[in-house]
């Protein structure tokens, strides 16, 4: 199986270089400083937990490398409103264009349509992208342990926190724990999809739970309905990042509602 992650990261490096040439670092920092006030991503999740509800991070995703086009009828603002009305805690918006057909415009449209906090879902490899996320209005950023070295994880987390954003740290297996040991974010995601093969197993989250005691654990990928949610909640996981299941639904709001 081709190492998909390495291919994505190589493309991302070229993309970031082009973006820096178009909008220099000083300007992107200024735009980040002028952005709308941050909405607390982690507080929104904890608010659902206090009500004994699953906290759903609902994803706005048009396509993926493994599945191709997922939702042809793709209207980010409309999708965001459906998610908010159905009880989602937060939004996740893909901004990667080459592999996920995402766009910063989708993030902006979604955030303007609702009051929910929004995560920039992308492959962050440079501090420029952290400033960029805030400039676009993101309230949180994803840091993928498999894509970054320890020093990068620590620098990017510190910068995100300095800008007021929540960090969702994404792990896949126990080999990534050591380089994350100094991170302070309370929000630790486990991607049930192996980013090197794109195969999915909920066992990934379960296998890491003992090492993540005291963290707010987010299970990502492979959650297909209420049975999966109840299965994970019975094992102490109450936060769910879900995209494809919702994106394939004719009635997105109704699909989200089935989880509660």
From Swiss-Prot:
The Enzyme Commission number assigned here is 4.1.1.48
Q: Does the keyword Transport apply?
A: no
Q: Which Gene3D superfamilies match?
A: Aldolase class I
Q: Which UniProt keywords apply?
A: Amino-acid biosynthesis, Aromatic amino acid biosynthesis, Decarboxylase, Lyase, Tryptophan biosynthesis
Q: Name one Pfam family in it.
A: IGPS
Pathway listed: Amino-acid biosynthesis; L-tryptophan biosynthesis; L-tryptophan from chorismate: step 4/5
Catalyses: 1-(2-carboxyphenylamino)-1-deoxy-D-ribulose 5-phosphate + H(+) = (1S,2R)-1-C-(indol-3-yl)glycerol 3-phosphate + CO2 + H2O
GO BP: L-tryptophan biosynthetic process
Q: Could you name the domain of life of the organism this protein comes from?
A: Bacteria
Presence of the UniProt keyword NADP in the record: no
Specify the enzyme's EC class, one word: lyase
Q: Supply the InterPro entries for this chain.
A: Aldolase_TIM, Indole-3-glycerol_P_synth, Indole-3-glycerol_P_synth_dom, Indole-3-GlycerolPSynthase_CS, RibuloseP-bd_barrel
Q: Name one GO molecular function term.
A: indole-3-glycerol-phosphate synthase activity
UniProt cross-references to HAMAP family, sorted A to Z: IGPS_B (MF_00134_B)
Q: Which PANTHER family match?
A: INDOLE-3-GLYCEROL-PHOSPHATE SYNTHASE, TRYPTOPHAN BIOSYNTHESIS PROTEIN
Q: According to its UniProt record, which protein family does this protein belong to?
A: Belongs to the TrpC family.
Provide the protein name. Answer: Indole-3-glycerol phosphate synthase
Q: Which organism is it from?
A: Neisseria gonorrhoeae (strain ATCC 700825 / FA 1090)
């Amino acid at each position: 199986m081709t190492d998909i992650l390495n291919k994505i990261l190589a493309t991302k490096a070229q993309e970031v270089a082009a973006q820096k040439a178009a909008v220099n670092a000083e300007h992107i920092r200024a735009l980040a400083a002028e952005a709308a006030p941050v909405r607390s991503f982690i507080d929104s999740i904890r608010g659902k937990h206090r009500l004994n509800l699953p906290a759903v991070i609902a994803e706005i995703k048009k396509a993926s490398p493994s599945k191709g086009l997922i939702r042809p009828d793709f209207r980010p603002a409309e999708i965001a409103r459906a998610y908010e009305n159905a009880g989602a805690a937060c939004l996740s918006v893909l901004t990667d264009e080459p592999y996920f057909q995402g766009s910063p415009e989708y993030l902006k449209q979604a955030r303007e349509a609702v009051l929910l906090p929004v995560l920039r879902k992308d492959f962050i490899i440079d501090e420029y992208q952290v400033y960029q996320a805030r400039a676009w209005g993101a309230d949180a950023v994803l840091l993928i342990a498999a894509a970054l070295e320890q020093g990068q994880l620590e620098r990017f987390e510190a910068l995100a926190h300095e800008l007021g954003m929540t960090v969702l740290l994404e792990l896949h297996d126990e080999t990534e724990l050591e380089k994350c040991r100094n991170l302070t974010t309370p929000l630790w995601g486990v991607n049930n999809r192996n980013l090197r093969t794109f195969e999915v197993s909920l066992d990934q989250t379960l296998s890491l739970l003992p090492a993540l005691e005291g963290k707010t654990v987010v299970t990502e990928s492979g959650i297909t309905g209420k049975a999966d949610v109840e299965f994970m909640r019975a094992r102490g996981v109450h936060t769910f990042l879900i995209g494809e299941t919702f994106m394939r639904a004719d009635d997105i709001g109704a699909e989200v509602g089935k989880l509660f």
